[in-house]
């Protein structure tokens, strides 16, 4: 006959052993392994010691290019954390690896690729001490140093893919993701104090060049510094065309990431302080008030939904993704042609992209920038 066991009947030591066993079982259950790649980056420290974290780390190493970078994490060519390359046969793994090696452009910074894998490897190494994760991380750092333009910018793809992918790319945090992790190595921060002195100094040089590039890319309108475009020309630093609906413009989204990075600099130069202050002023200037985005049902349309801008005096400020250089008018773009009303876009374009309604700068302007001002005024 089975005896029922109550945890309350156990002494304190046995209770603690039981609780630890439950936690360990939870950490390796299928529910834990089903987390997304983004969630993999933000787990508790203890999780990075688990078999699941190491399994994902091994997958990350498998998908690392011989050059040191990664292709974008799209769930097919490069599966995310819960994908199972490890359940394939050895022959299946070999064939798939060969197909990856045949990619013409195997490495990118698009969609957080490369730097996000590197951050994950550093955390798994810190938790496990297994050298293969450290080596993978350092291979990634060397790739980023190789990929950087002599003028300090980073392209979206390296080896260079023709077209907009060769531009200096702020879109989707490409350049900021790259310079931030190189800066972390240069400054020996936390998990990223992994480089020898020679490599660390190379990272310091790369960061200096990268910051100079950021300052050169800041768009000046009628003598005043404003913000950044998603892409900039790799020779002239001028705002440049991206994909067909990514016209040269001022970005209400990517500019926030640039400013936040610049604010991490411990001893900012007068030029960097001016760049931050000018961009924050511009972001405040272009906020859109008195309206909100209204998503509503419409069964006559594909997907049964539509979107429009409606008046709402009580609405919180919102921002547009693209602003016209010189006028600060929100831009809605289709096949390269600029519209000035959301309603002028086709239905597919109207609902398929967040042209307006984002609150990307909200926390920056309300919390982080005021705190930064206070911090640096106190230092002065």
Locate the predicted segments by residue:
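Terminal, non-catalytic domain-edge segments
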Residues: 35-56, 184-209, 235-242, 246, ...
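Solvent-exposed loop and edge beta-strand segments that line ligand/cofactor-binding
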Residues: 34, 41-49, 99-113, 162-175, ...
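Eukaryote-skewed repeat-based solenoidal scaffolds used as protein-protein interaction platforms
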Residues: 134, 138-141, 145, 162-218, ...
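N-terminal signal peptide c-region/cleavage motif recognized by signal peptidases
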Residues: 29-31
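Sec-dependent signal peptide recognition
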Residues: 14-24
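Long, well-ordered core segments of solenoidal/helical folds
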Residues: 55-68, 136-153, 204-223, 275-292
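Long, hydrophobic/aromatic-enriched structural stretches that serve as scaffold segments
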Residues: 89-128, 143
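Glycine- and aromatic-rich loop/turn segments at beta-sheet edges
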Residues: 35, 64-103, 146-166, 216-245, ...
């Amino acid at each position: 006959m089975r005896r029922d066991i109550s945890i309350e009947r156990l002494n304190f030591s046995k209770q603690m052993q039981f609780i630890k066993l439950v936690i360990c079982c939870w950490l390796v259950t299928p529910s834990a392994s089903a987390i997304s790649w983004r969630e993999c980056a933000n787990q508790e420290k203890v999780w990075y010691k688990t078999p699941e974290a190491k399994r994902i780390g091994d997958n990350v190493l498998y998908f690392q290019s011989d050059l040191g970078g990664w292709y974008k994490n799209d769930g097919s060519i490069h599966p995310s954390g819960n994908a199972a390359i490890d359940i394939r046969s050895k022959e299946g793994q070999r064939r798939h690896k060969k197909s990856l090696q045949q990619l013409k452009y195997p490495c990118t910074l698009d969609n957080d690729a490369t730097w996000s894998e590197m951050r994950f490897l550093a955390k798994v190494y810190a938790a496990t001490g297994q050298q293969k994760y450290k080596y993978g991380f350092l291979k990634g750092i060397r790739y980023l140093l190789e990929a950087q333009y002599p003028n300090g910018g980073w392209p979206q793809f390296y080896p260079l893919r023709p077209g907009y992918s060769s531009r200096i790319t702020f879109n989707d945090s490409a350049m900021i993701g790259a310079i931030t992790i190189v800066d972390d190595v240069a400054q020996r921060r936390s998990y990223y104090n992994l480089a020898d002195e020679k490599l660390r100094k190379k990272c310091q040089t790369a960061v200096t060049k990268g910051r100079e590039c950021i300052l050169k890319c800041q768009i000046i309108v009628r003598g005043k510094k404003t913000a950044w475009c998603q892409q900039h020309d790799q020779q002239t630093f001028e705002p440049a065309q991206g994909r067909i609906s990514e016209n040269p413009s001022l970005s209400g989204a990517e500019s926030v990431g640039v400013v936040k990075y610049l604010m991490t600099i411990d001893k900012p130069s007068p030029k960097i302080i001016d760049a931050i202050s000018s961009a924050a002023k511009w972001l405040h200037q272009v906020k859109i008030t008195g309206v909100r985005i209204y998503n509503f049902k419409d069964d006559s349309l594909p997907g049964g939904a539509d979107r429009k801008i409606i008046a709402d005096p009580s609405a919180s400020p919102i921002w547009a993704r693209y602003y016209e250089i010189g006028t600060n008018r929100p831009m809605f773009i289709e096949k390269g042609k600029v519209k000035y009303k959301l309603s002028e876009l086709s239905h597919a374009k109207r609902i398929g992209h967040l042209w307006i309604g984002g609150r990307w700068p909200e926390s920056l302007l309300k919390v982080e920038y005021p705190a930064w001002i206070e911090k640096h005024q106190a230092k002065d």
